[in-house]
From Swiss-Prot:
This is Ribosomal RNA small subunit methyltransferase I. Pfam families: TP_methylase. It comes from Rickettsia prowazekii (strain Madrid E). InterPro entries: 4pyrrol_Mease, 4pyrrol_Methylase_sf, 4pyrrole_Mease_sub1, 4pyrrole_Mease_sub2, rRNA_ssu_MeTfrase_I, SAM_MeTrfase_RsmI_CS. Keywords: Cytoplasm, Methyltransferase, rRNA processing, S-adenosyl-L-methionine, Transferase. Belongs to the methyltransferase superfamily. RsmI family. The gene is rsmI. PANTHER family: RIBOSOMAL RNA SMALL SUBUNIT METHYLTRANSFERASE I. The keyword Methyltransferase applies.
Length: 280
């Protein structure tokens, strides 16, 4: 397999070493160098699949000098692969600055897709999957965490976060304070022998985990704002009613905005009115 010089963003397993594509193995074997977060972790995966390519550290501590060196390797015609400790690179992992610099310089960039823990957790959670938002790692401090939750409380999408298991109970107590007793899912040890996903309302999950000592990282999923979803239905019904009374679009928008301004902007209401008016 002959690869074009450039950067290859290669997904790796999140737990089960067999969750790697044939293309990923071939790409890593035919690279001149593999950038990784931790050589000790990546070496185990490479050994499993008989990959002997040289490893080089690229992590959160890497700076512009490291990026310049990597760019010089690609400029010289080398094939460079980027992997993370687990899953898809750049998803709450280092790398986007390197990709941005290479993109600005018009160097070749390719992705070799594969598993990702947020998507794996979402598909197992039984929470709605049609709309979701991944917000990365939750901060350590309560105030910072509260700020993030407050920004997302009205979203209709399923929310996905990374968190540390040791902070889970405190996170859930705060989540209940901000979101109410919503349905959530806690996913851990994904694709491993002791994989576990627990779905229920926040009180149920707190009760389940309050006496269990957890380690490592978890994926926390919080269902979207059902009240907002209900208001969307109510908005559409309200507009349909107004149209049935032959009210003008301007009047309907003003009435709807006064009633639903805590959820929708005038622009969003205009869009719904326009859609309903011309599909009625």
């Amino acid at each position: 397999m002959i690869l074009k010089s450039g950067l290859y963003i290669v997904s790796t397993p999140i737990g089960n070493f067999e969750d790697i594509t044939l293309r990923a193995i071939s790409t890593l074997k035919n690279s001149d160098i593999i950038l990784c977060e931790d050589t000790r972790i990546s070496q185990k995966l490479l050994a499993k699949h008989y990959i002997h390519t040289k490893l080089q550290i690229y992590n959160d501590h890497s700076d512009y000098k490291d990026r310049e060196y990597i760019i010089s390797l690609i400029k010289a015609g080398n094939v460079v692969s980027l992997i993370s400790d687990a899953g898809t690179p750049l998803i709450s992992d280092p790398g986007y600055k390197l990709v941005r610099d290479l993109r600005n310089l018009n160097y070749y960039i390719e992705v070799v897709p594969g598993v990702s823990s947020p998507i794996t957790a979402l598909t197992l959670s039984s929470l709605p999957t049609d709309r979701f938002l991944f917000s990365g790692f939750l901060p350590k401090t309560i105030e910072s965490k509260k700020k993030i939750f407050a920004e997302l409380v009205n979203l209709k999408a399923t929310l996905i976060f990374f968190d540390t298991a040791s902070r889970l109970i405190n996170t859930l107590l705060l989540a209940k304070e901000i979101f109410g007793n919503r349905e959530i899912c806690v996913a851990r040890e994904l694709t491993k022998i002791y994989q576990e996903t627990k779905t229920g309302d926040i009180d149920e999950i707190i009760e389940f985990y309050k006496n269990n000592i957890l380690k490592g990282e978890i994926v926390l999923l919080i269902s979207g704002n059902v009240q907002v979803q209900n208001k969307q239905i109510n908005l559409e019904k309200f507009i349909e009613f107004c149209l049935s009374k032959n009210l003008s679009s301007k009047t309907i928008i003003e009435l709807a905005y006064d009633k639903f301004k805590d959820v929708y902007s005038k622009k969003e209401i205009y869009s719904v009115v326009h859609k309903k008016k011309f599909t009625a």
